[in-house]
Design a protein with these regions (language model features):
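Conserved N-terminal segment of class I S-adenosyl-L-methionine
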Residues: 1-108, 124-127, 133, 144, ...
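A short SAM/SAH-binding and catalytic strip from SAM-dependent methyltransferases
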Residues: 108-121
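Conserved acidic-Pro-Pro-aromatic motif
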Residues: 132-139
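Short strand-turn motif at the edge of the Rossmann-like AdoMet-binding core
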Residues: 140-146
C-alpha cells in the first residue's frame, strides 16, 4: 500500500458516496434508486478473467472499490460463488464509502466501476495504490460515459469521464513503476461495450 491522502475534493466525494449508500440516489431521469452499488460488475466478463487468473496462478485477490459485491454468495456463475468460480484461497475488500479497508499484498487486485468515480487529481495516486498491493496482476475497468446516477450535489456520479486512450496513457505511465506486475485494462465506451487492451507488464515489454 502507498501512503497517500485524497484531495479535499476526493474526500468530499467519498462522503457523498457514503451518503448515497445510506440513503440511495437520484437518477438522471429524476427517479430514485435505493439499491446502491451492489452490482457485481466482474460477472459480465467472468470467463476471460478466470482465464487470466489461471495464467497468473492467482489465489488471493483484493477487490478495490468493492461496493456491495459479495464473493461468497451463490449465483455468480450458476450456483457457484465468485470465490469458488475463481478457485481462490482468500479475498480481501476495500471500499472507503462503506468503511471497509482490508488492503494488503495479494496476487491480484481487481478494480471495477471505480476509476470514473475518482476526482481527476486523485486518479494517479489511486492507481499507484492499486499497483502497490499486487504481486502478479492488476485488472482495471474504467467507464467512459456518463452515469445514470447523480451525486447529492447534482453532479453526475462519473466525475472523471475520459476516453480509453487517456486511461491507457495514465496506466502505462504508472505501470512502469511496477515492472513485474501485469495489467489488464478494460475500458467501457458505453455500458454494454468493452474495449480490452492486451495484458502486459513493463518487464515483458523490455524482454
Amino acid at each position: 500500500m502507498t501512503n497517500f491522502t485524497l484531495s479535499p475534493k476526493g474526500q468530499k466525494l467519498v462522503e457523498m458516496y457514503t451518503d448515497m449508500v445510506d440513503k440511495g440516489y437520484k437518477k438522471v431521469d429524476g427517479t430514485y434508486e435505493a439499491n446502491v452499488y451492489n452490482d457485481f460488475e466482474l460477472k459480465k466478463i467472468r470467463g476471460s478473467i478466470k482465464e487470466r487468473f489461471k495464467i497468473h496462478k492467482i489465489k488471493t485477490v483484493l477487490d478495490y472499490g468493492c461496493g456491495g459485491s459479495d464473493w461468497s454468495s451463490s449465483g455468480f456463475n450458476e450456483d457457484q460463488s465468485a470465490f469458488d468460480f475463481f478457485e481462490l484461497d482468500r479475498v480481501y475488500r476495500y471500499e472507503p464509502a462503506r468503511s471497509i479497508d482490508e488492503r494488503t499484498m495479494v496476487d491480484a487486485v481487481i478494480c471495477f466501476d471505480v476509476l470514473e468515480h475518482i476526482f481527476v487529481s486523485d486518479v494517479a495516486n489511486v492507481i499507484r495504490d492499486i499497483f502497490s498491493c499486487a504481486e502478479k496482476l492488476v485488472v482495471l475497468n474504467g467507464a467512459c460515459y456518463p452515469a445514470n446516477a447523480t451525486l447529492p450535489n447534482g453532479e453526475n456520479a462519473h466525475v472523471t469521464i475520459r476516453n480509453p486512450e487517456w486511461w491507457k496513457g495514465v496506466v502505462d505511465t504508472i505501470s512502469v513503476e511496477f515492472p513485474n506486475v501485469s495489467v489488464t485494462l478494460i475500458c467501457s465506451p458505453t455500458y454494454n461495450k468493452m474495449l480490452a487492451y492486451p495484458t502486459y507488464s513493463d518487464h515483458a515489454r523490455q524482454s
